[in-house]
Design a protein with these regions (language model features):
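Hydrophobic residues within the alpha-helices of tandem HEAT/HEAT-like
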Residues: 30-34, 65-71, 104-110, 139-146, ...
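HEAT/HEAT-like alpha-solenoid repeats
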Residues: 4-10, 40-51, 75-88, 113-125, ...
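Acidic, serine/threonine-rich low-complexity intrinsically disordered linkers/hinges in large eukaryotic
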Residues: 1-8, 14-23, 36, 53, ...
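Short inter-helical turns and helix N-cap capping residues of alpha-solenoid HEAT/ARM repeat scaffolds
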Residues: 18-19, 54-55, 91-94, 128-130, ...
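Alpha-helical solenoid scaffolds in large eukaryotic transport, assembly, and signaling factors
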Residues: 1-4, 10-83, 105-109, 185, ...
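Solenoidal tandem-repeat scaffolds enriched in leucines and small polar residues
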Residues: 124-273
Length: 624
C-alpha cells in the first residue's frame, strides 16, 4: 500500500515540476496505466494544471487524459475549459494548438461543456488555417450528436457548413464538411446533404487536389447529385473517370459507383460501352491484389455484373481459379461465372468446372459440380453437354462428386422432364456410394418420379426402408412420396408391400409431425379414392425456372448506392446490421463511433494487409 502511495506521490511531484521532461514522463506513466484499465482519475486536478504548457507534445497527452475522464469527472473538467478556450482563441499562435483544443472540446462528450465550445467553434470555422477549419467541421457533428438544438438553431452551425460547401477552397475542409453533414443526417433521420450543380462542380474541381482519403469524401458528395441534363452527365463522367485508374481500391469503387449511376441516365449507347471498357481494367487490377482485397473486389463485381453484365461479358476467364487461391475467393468466383455464362463460353466453362472436380477442397468441388447443373438449367441448348459432363464426373467414382452430381441431375430432370432418362443407368450403378442425406433424398425422388421407367424401382426403393426410423426428415418425407408414387404408377405387389410398410412407420412410429401428417393424408386419400389420389400425387409438375442467384431489384438498388461499403460484403442493407442507423433512412452510409478520431469513419471496406513493422498489428482496417 505504501509503495503505491509513494509512486503516486512521485508522479504528483513530477507533474507539479517546472521541467517539461519530468511532466511528460509522469503523464506518459499515467496514460500507460489508464490504457490497461487502472483508475488514475484521482490525479485529475494535478494533470489539468499541466494544460497551460506551451509544449505541444505535453499538451496532447494532457488532452488525451482529459477526454478519457471527462464523463467521469464533469465538474473537474470545467476547470480545463478556460485553458481550452484560450488555446482555441490563440490566433497568433500555432494552428495545431487551436485545432487540438477545438477537437478536444468536441470529444469531451459532456453536455454542460458544449455551450462553452460554441464560440471557439464559430471562430474555428472562420479560421484562416484550413487545418483548423476542417477540425471545426467535424466538431459540428459532435455537438449535434449531444445537443442538436444548440448546433442547428442557436448558433446556425449547419447552415455555416452548407455555405462552406460552395465557398471553401481547401479540399480537406470540403471533405470534412461532407462527412459532418452525412453524420448529422444519420443522427437526424433526414438527409440534409443537398448538392446542386454548382456545389457538384465545386467538389469536382477539388477532386484531384488531395490524397485518396479526401477524394473518397468528395466523391461521396458528388454521388449525391442527380443530373437532369445530358451536358451535366457528360461533364461529370469526363471529370471523374480519371480517378478510376487510382491505386486506392476505395477511390476506384467510389468512382465506379457514380459512373454506374450516371450510365442509367446516359442516352448514347456508345458512351455506355466506352465507360464500361474503362471500368473493366481497374477492376481487373484489383483482382491481382492481396487475397483479402480480391474478396472485396469480387463481392462488388458480383453486384456490378448483375447491373451491367457488359463490363465482363467477354472476360470470363479472369474469374477462373487457381489451386493456390483461398476458398472464399474461389467460391465467390463461381458465383460470378454463373452470372456470366452464356452459349458463347459454355464449353470453356464446362471444361474448367470439370477440372475443379479434382481440387483438394471438397466444398469447392461440390459447389463446382452444382454449378454445372445450374448452367444446364440456365442454358437449355447446353443442357445436353452439361448432363454429359455430370455423367463423366460420376464415372470418377469419387463419392462426394457422385452425390453432388445426383443432386444436380435431380434439378435437371425437373427442369427437362422425360429428356435425359439415359443418365439414370449411371445413377443406379452408384447407389452404394451415397451417404449424404441430400443426395439420398435426390435419388429417392428420382426413383419415385420415374418408377414406371426404372427397371426394378421397387427393389431400389426397399433398400432405403430398412433403417427408416434412423433417417433424417428429408429422407423420410421423400421415401413417403416416392413409395406412394411407385405404387400408383406400377400397381405391383412389391410396391403395395413397400407402401404398407411406409404407412405403418409414418402413422405409428414416426416422431416428426410433418411426416406423420402427410402419411395420414396419403393413407386416407388412397383409402377414399385411389384415382383422385393419383391425380393429386402423380401429376405433371411445373418446370422449375432458371436458377436465379442474383439480388432482387430493391436490394440491388440499395447495394449499388452503397458500393464499396460493408453492405456489399454482407449483401444486406446497412440498416440491417448497423443498429444506430435510422430505419427510415434507406441507402445511407454506415454510422460508426467517431470518438478520438480526426475523421468521421464514413465509408468502410475491410482491406487486410501485412504491416511492415513487426510491432504493429498484422491486420489493419483501412477506412475509405
Amino acid at each position: 500500500m505504501s509503495t503505491s502511495t509513494n509512486k503516486a506521490g512521485d508522479i504528483i511531484d513530477d507533474l507539479i515540476s517546472l521541467k517539461v521532461d519530468r511532466q511528460k514522463t509522469a503523464i506518459k506513466k499515467i496514460i500507460s496505466a489508464m490504457t490497461i484499465g487502472r483508475d488514475v482519475s484521482k490525479l485529475f486536478p494535478h494533470v489539468v494544471k499541466c494544460i497551460i504548457t506551451p509544449n505541444l507534445e505535453l499538451k496532447k497527452l494532457v488532452y488525451l487524459y482529459i477526454i478519457n475522464y471527462a464523463r467521469v469527472k464533469p465538474l473537474e473538467t470545467l476547470l480545463a475549459v478556460n485553458a481550452l478556450k484560450r488555446d482555441a482563441s490563440d490566433f497568433n499562435g500555432n494552428p495545431l494548438t487551436r485545432a487540438l483544443a477545438v477537437r478536444t472540446m468536441g470529444c469531451l462528450g459532456v453536455e454542460e461543456i458544449m455551450q462553452f465550445l460554441c464560440d471557439p467553434l464559430k471562430d474555428a470555422l472562420n479560421d484562416k488555417d484550413p487545418y483548423v477549419r476542417k477540425t471545426g467541421a467535424l466538431c459540428v457533428a459532435k455537438i449535434y450528436d449531444i445537443n442538436p438544438q444548440l448546433a442547428e438553431d442557436q448558433f446556425g452551425f449547419l447552415d455555416k457548413i452548407k455555405e462552406m460547401l460552395e465557398e471553401e477552397t481547401n479540399a480537406m475542409v470540403l471533405a470534412n464538411c461532407i462527412s459532418a453533414l452525412i453524420e448529422i443526417s444519420t443522427t437526424k433521420g433526414k438527409d440534409i446533404l443537398e448538392i446542386n450543380w454548382s456545389k457538384c462542380r465545386h467538389l469536382m474541381s477539388a477532386l484531384h487536389e488531395n490524397n485518396e482519403w479526401t477524394q473518397i469524401y468528395l466523391l461521396e458528395g458528388i454521388s449525391r447529385y442527380s443530373p437532369t441534363k445530358q451536358d451535366e452527365i457528360n461533364e461529370m463522367i469526363e471529370r471523374i473517370i480519371p480517378c478510376v485508374s487510382h491505386s486506392n481500391a476505395g477511390v476506384v469503387l467510389s468512382v465506379i459507383k457514380i459512373l454506374i449511376k450516371l450510365l442509367d441516365l446516359v442516352e448514347n449507347p456508345e458512351t455506355i460501352r466506352s465507360v464500361c471498357k474503362k471500368i473493366t481494367p481497374s477492376l481487373v487490377t484489383l483482382l491481382s491484389s492481396e487475397p483479402e482485397i480480391q474478396y472485396v473486389a469480387l463481392k462488388n463485381i458480383n453486384i456490378l455484373i448483375q447491373k451491367r453484365p457488359i463490363i465482363f461479358e467477354k472476360d470470363i476467364k479472369i474469374f477462373f481459379s487457381s489451386f493456390t487461391e483461398p476458398l472464399y475467393n474461389k467460391l465467390e468466383k463461381l458465383e460470378i461465372i454463373y452470372k456470366l455464362v452464356s452459349m458463347n463460353n459454355i464449353d470453356i466453362v464446362l471444361n474448367e468446372l470439370k477440372e475443379y472436380a479434382s481440387d483438394v477442397d471438397i466444398k469447392f468441388v461440390r459447389r463446382s459440380v452444382k454449378l454445372i447443373g445450374q448452367c444446364a438449367i440456365k442454358l437449355e441448348k447446353a443442357a445436353q453437354r452439361c448432363v454429359e459432363t455430370l455423367v463423366e464426373l460420376v464415372k470418377t467414382q469419387v463419392s462426394f462428386v457422385i452425390q453432388e452430381a445426383i443432386i444436380a441431375l435431380k434439378d435437371i430432370f425437373r427442369r427437362y422432364p422425360n429428356t435425359f432418362e439415359g443418365a439414370m443407368a449411371i445413377i443406379n450403378e452408384n447407389l452404394r456410394t451415397l451417404d449424404d442425406p441430400e443426395a439420398k433424398a435426390a435419388l429417392i425422388w428420382i426413383i419415385g418420379e420415374y418408377s414406371d421407367r426404372i427397371e426394378g424401382a421397387e427393389n431400389q426403393l426397399i433398400k432405403f426402408i430398412d433403417n427408416l426410423k434412423e433417417e433424417p426428415y428429408v429422407i423420410q418425407i421423400n421415401i413417403l412420396d416416392s413409395a406412394t408414387k411407385t405404387f400408383l404408377k406400377c400397381q405391383s405387389e412389391e410396391s403395395y408391400n413397400i407402401l404398407n410398410q411406409v404407412f405403418d412407420f409414418c402413422t405409428k412410429e414416426c416422431e416428426d409431425p410433418d411426416v406423420r401428417d402427410r402419411g395420414y393424408m396419403y393413407y386416407r386419400l388412397m383409402t377414399i379414392d385411389p384415382q383422385l389420389a393419383s391425380k393429386i400425387i402423380v401429376n405433371d409438375k411445373p418446370r422449375i425456372n432458371e436458377d436465379v442467384s442474383g439480388f432482387d431489384d430493391n436490394l440491388l438498388a440499395i447495394l449499388m448506392d452503397n458500393l464499396g461499403t460493408m453492405a456489399t460484403i454482407y449483401e444486406k442493407p446497412p440498416e440491417a446490421f448497423v443498429k444506430k442507423l435510422k430505419k427510415n433512412i434507406s441507402r445511407m452510409i454506415m454510422k460508426v463511433n467517431m470518438k478520438n478520431h480526426n475523421l468521421i469513419l464514413m465509408r468502410m471496406i475491410i482491406i487486410c494487409q501485412k504491416k511492415k513493422k513487426k510491432k504493429k498489428r498484422r491486420w489493419i482496417l483501412l477506412i475509405i
